[in-house]
Amino acid sequence: MDDTTAREELRFFLKDTVRRSVDFFRTAQNLGAPPPPVQKPVPGGAARISLPGPEKWTAVGDLSLREAMGRRRSVRQFSNRPFTLEELAFLLWATQGVRGESDPVRTYRTVPSAGCRHPFETYLAVFRVEGLEKGLYRYLPLEHALLPLGHPDRLEEETARAALGQKFAGKGAVTFFWTALPW
């Protein structure tokens, strides 16, 4: 599928008219299908990289939410300074971290989700993170760990291409991608 076709399909889905042609009540959940796992299965014997937990974070600081929101801005020019593994661990925990498990199909996380479903899977294109090789990774929130997925050539260019040609996506220390396991 070329970029123009993909853009048009995405645009259609985001328009209000999509409800006229898509029956949103025919979901897997409404049709009685079992829920997906809390985390996509990890291949047996796969190597994992443990991340430092909250008790080890010293470089994250004590900025109040109000102050953080007041300072927030978009930046498209990135420092060449690599992230520390601690900084990456904090960002992953803040965006999808598990605080507890309710039952085998629900978790309590640092972010809200209707019915504790949390369908998101977090993938990373790592360019400059201390202690990690440049490459693709998947975050394992139940373990607070990374699953290495490979080290493709031209990662910066392919990341920008995946972001519909936005070159800045391949220039930061790390780029987050989210996919969903809908139910």
Residue ranges, per PLM feature:
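N-terminal accessory segments that position/regulate proteins before the catalytic core
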Residues: 1-175, 181-183
